[in-house]
From Swiss-Prot:
Its EC number is 6.3.1.5. CDD domains: NAD_synthase. Disulfide bonds: none annotated. Homodimer. This is NH(3)-dependent NAD(+) synthetase.
Amino acid sequence: MTLQQEIIQALGAKPHINPEEEIRRSVDFLKAYLKTYPFLKSLVLGISGGQDSTLAGKLSQMAIAELREETGDNALQFIAVRLPYGVQADEQDCQDAIAFIQPDRVLTVNIKGAVLASEQALREAGIELSDFVRGNEKARERMKAQYSIAGMTHGVVVGTDHAAEAITGFFTKYGDGGTDINPLHRLNKRQGKQLLAALGCPEHLYKKVPTADLEDDRPSLPDEAALGVTYDNIDDYLEGKTLDSAIAKTIEGWYVKTEHKRRLPITVFDDFWKR
């Protein structure tokens, strides 16, 4: 088995999908989990206004609405969480995503004060954060807020990770990578677009340039610029296509280098890192 085949198998990626079937699969998956643990009453998700959180949010709201109708349990709710750092540059996109999703409840937690307080506490301890590490602080603060909300609403935190992010480890460890349930796992980036199109999402929300937008020195830095490859490259790789060797090497390099992000904390029984 080639490394490409190994990666595709590990991430559950498929070269072709039926969008309607995958929508149903994700919604039923979320419903089944909640039905298995009836003490859970909410799905909690941070909404940024980008493709991934818009899709995960819509699927979550669909799952909650269907389950509420089926069970008569009106305590069930989907909570969309706005998590700006100060003023969000693409505020209108976030509002448009909320309008599309129609969540049961919308909360806004501005993380800037908490991040600055953490940065100051570290500074007083003699640790001066780089802009990159401050970006990771933002991602982790967002997840901290979501887990606090989930803890107070008997909920689980929904993730937005998908195959095209997982393969490169393009997420913050214990930040946006630290979630309870990931309904998009297995899908590549273009397949996510197909699901949103089938759901009637406004095109500008899934055709916009993807960005984590975590760094102050490089605001709205495109994911593709940070990775050195395009999402089309990554999607082609995940679909089993043959790529230019340099591009394939870059993608595989990211996969190997970030394997620790896709694992639980390393123990003496683990040997994946020795490859």
